Amino acid sequence: MRPSHDPSRRRFLKAAGGVAAASALPGAAIPYVHPAGNEELQVALIGCGGRGTGAAMDALSTQSKLGPIKLVAMADIFPQRLKRSLSQIRDGYAAQVDVPEDRQFIGLEGYRQAMDAVKPGGVAIFATPPAFRWVHFQYAIQRGLNVFLEKPVTVDGPTSRRMLELAGEADQKGLKVGVGLMVRHCRGRQELYERLRGGEIGEILMLRAYRMHGPVGYAFSGPKPPNMSDFLYQIQRFHSFLWASGGLFSDFYIHQVDECCWMKGAWPVKAHATGGRHYRGDAIDQNFDSYSVEYTFADGTKFFLDGRTMNGCHNEFASYAHGTKGSAVISTAGHTPGKVRTFRSQRMKDEDLIWAYPQPERNPYQLEWEDLIEAIRQNKPYNEVRRGVEASLVTSMGRMAAHTGRVVTYDEMLNCPHEFAPGLDKLTSPDSPAPLQPGPDGKYPIPEPGIKKDREY
């Protein structure tokens, strides 16, 4: 699923593959160990917030189908978050949790200690702020661990290029890597993709997606508490800061970017966008609360994405495709159930229905784990990093277009030299200076479209 017009991108991927094939990580002497079907898989959870806790529970849920699996180590920078996560996981899977005090690791170095506690061939779950993905992935490869990466996997050009190189190194060691774009594992959407490829609604001319609701996660943040460092505050409220997560745009909109581009069978080549901040009072985060993006594919097809994080407004959380012979619902109201359908008209009325995936449907958050663990058990090739990087890049492309007020191309985003948070692999203390510093008023720099054009803040 690659822009066919894009020779520079093809040259880059070829070069990145060559670098990966010709190089080895320092100290990467630990071989990959393929676990037998009845051998216990050990799991380490790095990042113990809500998404990490959910991912760990989904991993443990595979035991009845795919063999024994146990959580043996956890790491987080906040001790209370680790304790809360451990309690929740034990409530559902007590017999599959063996995480004593000496395997509960707190601090920036905790990710290493947690992975060191897992036998080669086990699984590391990364659900920390996305800025740390490449740092943690690099160490997992060195340790010979399979990996689950929560989305997004990158937030800028330099880390995207780095992750593509690491993907090649993971392949070289036979590691299996899943990425938390779970709608790709939705069986209904998989069938919809095949139907669209078969021409059920004709040639796709337009896609559109909406994510409109009130404040979610840590998207909006007020002034920092006086007893907390900027670094810890930014990690705790990572959705508010572009260096940590790509902001709410990257962290929340990536699923619909991914599912729409999947149905098209291509990635867009450019984007232009608008966005703004409203009614924000003393908020100090970097996010806009409304975004509107027009993505363009190489063949001229358009993909329109509208996002709004604002109370009191019309809410919608859905994606659609429109073709020359009809239309399709890609998602209905959130990620699951998808309730995908095709229609012989653009009206999407019941009387025009061609096909609908039978209900109820299985949860893709569980299916993505079954697919990953099956690949580990059967030693099948499985690496979703490249697609995860591409989805992250396209999302970042739309975000940067809104934040700068410019048309941004895929090539430009991939090769952009600006790294939001260089040197994260060197940080060892929570007292380290934050990658983003506040002004004298305690507020952080925000995007200024048309004024700041070469970078987002």
What function would you assign to each model-found segment?
Residues 19-96, 260, 453-455:
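N-terminal Rossmann-like dinucleotide-binding module
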Residues 47-52, 172-178, 183-285, 293, ...:
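Predominantly a Rossmann-like dinucleotide-binding segment in NAD(P)-dependent oxidoreductases
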Residues 1-20:
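N-terminal secretory signal peptides and thylakoid transit peptides that target proteins
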Residues 39-42, 67-70, 100-102, 119-124, ...:
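Loop/turn elements at helix/coil->beta-strand transitions in domains of secreted/extracellular proteins
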Residues 134-185, 199:
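Beta-strand-loop-alpha-helix segment that lines the small-molecule cofactor/substrate pocket
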Residues 16-21, 28, 54, 232, ...:
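C-terminal helical cap and adjacent loop that interface with cofactors, partners, or active-site loops
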Residues 92-126:
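A structured beta-alpha segment of the ubiquitous adenosine-cofactor-binding alpha/beta core
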